[in-house]
Amino acid sequence: MYSYMRSRNKVCIGDYLLCHAAFVLPAAFACYKTDGDLKKLKGNTAYLSRMIDANIEDCRAIRSAGHTILPKEDTDFESAAYRKTCLRFFKLICATSLGKICASDHAMNAVDEMSALDRDLRRFFEEVGADDPVWQALEREAGKYLQ
């Protein structure tokens, strides 16, 4: 997948897009779970941790399929430091209007786009035999929004 985008000595945009989707979609799932009101998840560390778990599952699959984890700062995605950074970010977007601006407004107004992205990632993960039970659970909880 995306092999046509690889070029020598350059960042592969396909790798970046896979990694970006693996981070963004759990946030979209959270928006759909809360009907766009991320403040409902404020303080719900268990759910926010599941978002991070889903991201990590998918980064493993992306790496196992031979893709590079991008940006380079995220290559240590299984570390405690990565989890801590992600948790802080997710807490911030759930506790402030930043979540509405950065995540909710986009997810709630781009359901077709997020659904297509989810379908494409699902297909990719099935092709590479990814083990992603947390991702699948968050996907189910997104409910009626994903098509």
PLM regions with names:
Residues 1-70:
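Internal alpha-helical scaffold of NAD(P)-dependent oxidoreductase catalytic cores
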Residues 56, 63-147:
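NAD(P)-dependent Rossmann-like dehydrogenase/reductase catalytic/cofactor-binding core
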